[in-house]
Design a protein with these regions (language model features):
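A short, Lys/Arg-rich alpha-helix, primarily the initiator
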Residues: 2-31, 108
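Residues within the helices of the helix-turn-helix
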Residues: 26-27, 37, 67
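Short alpha-helical DNA-recognition segment
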Residues: 31-53
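DNA major-groove recognition helix of helix-turn-helix
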Residues: 54-55, 65, 84
């Protein structure tokens, strides 16, 4: 039986995955030699604080902006989107791509993160 969106354990896992995505995005930005402000400018954001929110796990890269973010950090757009999908929608990622160990994010325990 599916869990409710209000399920605290699921919410904790979702939060942990968003934080992992944020760390991955920050590492990609830093590897590209960009500041948050420079990335924001390259992807057409008015405020760099959105980049900060995404990197801290409080926000998500919108689907329609993932190609621009990928280009800005020098990543293949398809792989970039696939990586974000595994963090943002792990069940959909599993259905589309299976449970390949290299693609599966580590499910965090409710108390960790």
């Amino acid at each position: 039986m599916p869990r409710s969106a209000a399920d605290p354990a699921k919410a904790a896992v979702t939060k942990g995955l968003r934080q992992e995505a944020g760390r991955w995005l920050k590492a990609a930005r830093e590897a590209a030699g960009l500041t948050q402000a420079e990335l924001a400018e390259q992807v057409g954001l008015r405020y760099y604080t959105f980049v900060s929110q995404v990197e801290s796990g409080l926000g998500r890269v919108p689907i329609e902006a993932q190609g621009a973010w990928a280009a800005a950090v020098g990543h293949d757009p398809a792989q970039f989107a696939r990586t974000l999908l595994r963090y943002y929608e792990p069940e959909l990622h599993r259905l589309l791509f299976g449970d390949a160990a290299e693609d599966a994010p580590r499910a965090r325990q409710a108390g960790r993160g």
